[in-house]
Amino acid sequence: MAQGAARCPPRVARKAAGPGGRATFPSVSESDSLQARVDRLELPFNEFGVDPYGISKRHLKQALPVFAALYRYYFRVRCFGIEHIPPRGRAMLVGNHSGGVAVDGAMVLASTMLEMEPPRLAQGMVERFLHKFPVSSLWASRTGQFTGLPEHARRLLEDDRLLMIFPEGAKGTAKLYRQRYSLVDFGTGFIRLALQTRSPIIPFAFLGGGTAIPTVFNAYGLGKLLGVPYVPLTPYVLPLPLPVQLEIHYGEPLVFQGTGDEEDHVIEGYVQKVKARISGLIERGRAERHGRRQGTRLLP
């Protein structure tokens, strides 16, 4: 990312986290502002506040204050380059997984809702196991997060939605603490999807999730008993996120030409270009983070 890229401007002044780093929930005036941001989403809600995909204004208005508290006060997220996300029209946010719990996706969603003008809803593709749990499945779909099926993703883009994709898949969430800034193999489906729908790809780097949830071991056997792929275990056993400052670095859009029917080696070449861009954003973000902590300014 170019030096000096604009930081996402906070729409509401941040407050210090509560005692012990706990999230402080928004005040009444802030809650009113959050409700207004949901109302300003440019989605085709009907008279009951539900869009054609089942996204519910009521559920978004209940969820956004929780996301805002985590984003602004608990994780104190720093966001850079959000001007690279188009305010309207189809686009794909493609980035790295960071941490064994879906903190990354939640905070990316929060950034587009809280920092963009007008606000946009980033819609993600969730793992199928989530639908084994009725409550989480309901809330996921009512807030725009759907099962990661190609037909769902294509329909969303054809309807000019903002799609959030983590091409590392479930393997990306299984990274241990020592692997937190590495990238595992990317799937290729997202490139074919981008070509078929002529969607720009906005790469992003998510930093800090692996420190917030410092996974030292993944308990696959326990996960099987609980109906999930695995349970990440930390030095304090439970995978509860620590109040570590997180960062999101959005890069300039990537546009590839093609139909999506290209040979595998062509698609793989495009995948590697996206992966290299995300890796570059991670390394640049880490260097800038280190520079701020050291009180030094990075050279160009």
Where are these regions (language model features)?
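Non-catalytic C-terminal accessory region of glycerolipid acyltransferases
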Residues: A2-H59, R154-P300
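Membrane-anchoring hydrophobic helices of lipid-metabolizing enzymes
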Residues: R7, R11-E151, A219, E283-P300
